[in-house]
Amino acid sequence: MKAAVFIAPGQIEVQETAKPEIDGENQAIIRVVRASVCGSDLWWYRGIAKREANALVGHEAIGVVEQVSADVSQIKAGDFVIVPFTHGCGHCVACLNGFEGNCLNQKPGSNGGYQAEFMKYEPADSGLVKIPGAPADYTDEQLASLQTLSDVMATGFHAAKNAEIKPGDTVAVIGDGAVGLCGVIGAKLLGAEKIILLSHHEDRAALGREFGATDIVAQKGAAAVQQVLALTKENAGVDAVLECVGAAGAIDQAGQIARLGAVIGRVGVPHAEPKSNQLFWKNIGLRGGIASVTKPDKELLLKAVLDGEINPGKVFTRSFDLDHAADAYAAMDQRQAIKSLLVID
């Protein structure tokens, strides 16, 4: 089968590799229909994080189950499924408390190899989410939105839930990448009345407005803080902040624009240790981490996509076939795409 392989920073190749086989319990072999490049993939693509050479890559996909191990009871061959990037066992302390992204039984190295014609996933029963029907029942636009549920839309929703957004809240979203834009959708789903997107790029700001942002703040630094505060009641700050960047400065900025007692939902992969003293003095809560979107959340998002309530697939501004996976990475690295979609069927 064909699969995208990491060779060295800045170098992705599509190679012929062995098709995965069932070799344990609670496993499924999946024919991949759509995959995508995640912003976190750029860390090792750019050489910021280490990755072993010749590793199979990718952690976002939807596809059709081809085979399952004998013990699997909830999933069967022929099922169309979301293949999430988390691998929760469903029964450890972390999973039972809703943190499947921190599953205590996750196998090292199990998160990868989704950018391929076939992949193996475990635990099949607790992790895979069924999509009604078959891929042929959906338009390309719908398939793109379904693909976001494997990570980016789920991560944006995780930020919104962690920020404890309530109906009528004023919310700020820091970061106009795919996660931040999906955070806008998440905030709207939870009932936010005013959604302020901090964005320096016209195309991303326009998409943010389409997703539900009511205000765009294009300034940076202190000017951005002042503009956000001016959009809030009595200049007191927002009720919730979605931090979708990860830079220490983003957390600092979140603390500056949050009102007393607000909550920051943090999903940006950390770049450095932020200063947290201002959060203490303002009684601001800071929650978040690896998206641990539970099955009920995934099913809520799936229903929203199937009902046409949300269309997060619009974050995919470039599409590529698997043979051009290297171009998909380059497009995101060079900011020529908000997010790259791989069409594999």
Feature-to-residue mapping (PLM):
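Mid-domain Rossmann-like dinucleotide-binding core that forms the NAD(H)/NADP(H) cofactor-binding site
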Residues: D137-A222, Q226, F280
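Residue-level marker of beta-strand positions
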Residues: Q27, E60, D79-F80, A94, ...
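NAD(P)H dinucleotide-binding glycine-rich loop of Rossmann-like/cofactor-binding domains
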Residues: C89-I174
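N-terminal glycine-rich cofactor-binding segment
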Residues: V5-I22, G39-Q67, I82-V83, L96-G112
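Glycine-rich cofactor phosphate-binding loops and adjacent beta1-alpha1 units
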Residues: A163-E164, A206-R287, A326
